[in-house]
């Protein structure tokens, strides 16, 4: 068993407190607490309050989820309601599979 766990750094870009933003955050927190409890850092960025951060990271639409670490950077734009699509899109499902294989 690998005692040194990876830390996943994620940024969720939202536009205010809209239903899409609230749903994206709720779904993402559910995924993270279920599959990555204790090994993630999530920063929620409201592009209406911090447009410069969205511009720096080239965010064109919300909600956008960005996996910053571990590399490579991956982004998902739009609906985050499908757990498997989120994990595959961020290249986390494959990493999760490999880590479980190593533990066996």
Curated annotation (Swiss-Prot):
Query: Record's InterPro entries?
Result: Circ_KaiB (IPR013474), KaiB-like (IPR039022), KaiB_domain (IPR011649), Thioredoxin-like_sf (IPR036249)
Q: Which domain of life is it from?
A: Bacteria
Q: Where are the transmembrane segments?
A: none
Q: Which GO terms describe its biological process?
A: circadian rhythm
Q: Which UniProt keywords apply?
A: Biological rhythms
Read off the Gene3D superfamilies from this record: Glutaredoxin (3.40.30.10)
This protein's domain notes:
Has 2 forms, fold switches to a thioredoxin-like fold (KaiB(fs)) when bound to KaiC.
Q: Which NCBIfam families match?
A: circ_KaiB, PRK09301.1
In terms of PANTHER family, this protein maps to: CIRCADIAN CLOCK PROTEIN KAIB2 (PTHR41709:SF2), KAIB-LIKE PROTEIN 1 (PTHR41709)
Q: What does this protein do?
A: Key component of the KaiABC oscillator complex, which constitutes the main circadian regulator in cyanobacteria. Complex composition changes during the circadian cycle to control KaiC phosphorylation. KaiA stimulates KaiC autophosphorylation, while KaiB sequesters KaiA, leading to KaiC autodephosphorylation. Phospho-Ser-431 KaiC accumulation triggers binding of KaiB to form the KaiB(6):KaiC(6) complex, leading to changes in output regulators CikA and SasA. KaiB switches to a thioredoxin-like fold (KaiB(fs)) when bound to KaiC. A metamorphic protein which reversibly switches between an inactive tetrameric fold and a rare, thioredoxin-like monomeric fold (KaiB(fs)). KaiB(fs) binds phospho-KaiC, KaiA and CikA. KaiA and CikA compete for binding to KaiB(fs), and KaiB(fs) and SasA compete for binding to KaiC, thus the clock oscillator and output signal pathway are tightly coupled.
Q: Partners and quaternary state?
A: The KaiABC complex composition changes during the circadian cycle to control KaiC phosphorylation. Complexes KaiC(6), KaiA(2-4):KaiC(6), KaiB(6):KaiC(6) and KaiC(6):KaiB(6):KaiA(12) are among the most important forms, many form cooperatively. Undergoes a major conformational rearrangment; in the free state forms homotetramers as a dimer of dimers. When bound to the CI domain of KaiC switches to a monomeric thioredoxin-fold (KaiB(fs)). KaiB(fs) binds CikA, leading it to dephosphorylate phospho-RpaA.
Return the similarity comment.
Belongs to the KaiB family.
| UniProt-recorded name of the protein | Circadian clock oscillator protein KaiB
Q: Which organism is it from?
A: Picosynechococcus sp. (strain ATCC 27264 / PCC 7002 / PR-6)
């Amino acid at each position: 068993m690998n005692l040194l766990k990876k830390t996943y750094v994620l940024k969720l870009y939202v536009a205010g407190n809209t239903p899409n933003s609230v749903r994206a955050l709720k779904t993402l927190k559910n995924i993270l607490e279920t599959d990555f409890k204790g090994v993630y850092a999530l920063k929620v960025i409201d592009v209406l309050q911090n447009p410069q951060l969205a511009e720096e990271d080239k965010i064109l639409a919300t909600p956008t989820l960005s996996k910053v670490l571990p590399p490579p950077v991956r982004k998902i734009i739009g609906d985050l309601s499908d757990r498997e699509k989120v994990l595959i899109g961020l290249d986390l499902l494959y990493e999760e599979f490999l880590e479980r294989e190593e533990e066996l």
